[in-house]
Design a protein with these regions (language model features):
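Class I SAM-dependent transferase core
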Residues: 1-72, 80-84, 88, 101-118, ...
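Conserved nucleotide-cofactor-binding alpha/beta core module
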Residues: 64-184
Length: 208
């Protein structure tokens, strides 16, 4: 990943170590294993993808994680991003709306020894309130607006990274940071993610 990640500006050594350690080929199908370490997304079935390594690194770095952090992930997919997080933090909670993907990711993560990841099937728009508040929230699929339930579940000083924009349209990666009662919002870069699915995904956000 040297050219893909380090030479493109990723500096967080915890993220870099995790990216080197996690076997990305274990998170893709047999037919895509030769491309597992290429810097582009790959299909994982059910209309979903595993994100390109550089974007995984960018999003992980922006969260400013430490080993005591508790993280909520929306969009488990293959489980790759959760594994990266699990190498860095104490506990990861991950929500996946596609039951087959959730089950496969849970089995895969357990097999690889990531016992600090909990996976559940559910509507990611609603988050996982039972374990809130979170130090960090990462969303790996794009809602059109910031989901208010996720903002509510972000702890004091917490950071959220998520793509925003319409399916098939112009999207951007955003960083949200809770500062007291305010949410500071910063645009990071243009991106292209699969759309957040779920019955409440189109609900307007008060932060847009």
């Amino acid at each position: 990943f040297k050219w893909q990640i380090e030479e493109r500006g990723i500096r967080d050594q915890r993220v870099l170590r995790a990216m080197r350690k996690v076997p990305r080929h274990e998170f893709v199908s047999e037919e895509h294993r030769q491309q597992a370490y290429d810097d582009h997304p790959l299909p994982i079935g059910h209309g979903q993808t595993i994100s390109q390594p550089y974007i995984v690194a960018v999003m992980s770095e922006q969260l400013r994680l430490d080993e005591g952090s508790r993280v909520l992930e929306i969009g488990t997919g293959s489980g790759y991003q959760a594994a990266i997080l699990a190498e860095i933090v104490a506990q990861v909670y991950s929500v996946e709306i596609v039951p087959e993907l959730a089950a496969a990711a849970k089995t895969r993560l357990q097999r690889l020894g990531y016992h600090n990841v909990e996976v559940r099937t559910g509507d990611g728009y609603l988050g996982w309130p039972e374990h809130a508040p979170y130090d960090a929230i990462i969303v790996t699929c794009a809602p059109e607006n910031v989901p208010p339930p996720l903002v509510d579940q972000l702890g004091a000083g917490g950071r959220m990274v998520l793509p925003l924009g319409p399916a098939g349209g112009r999207q951007a990666l955003w960083l949200l940071e809770r500062q007291g009662r305010k949410i500071r919002k910063k645009r990071l870069m243009g991106v292209a993610f699969v759309h957040l699915t779920g019955r409440q995904a189109p609900t307007p956000s008060p932060f847009d």
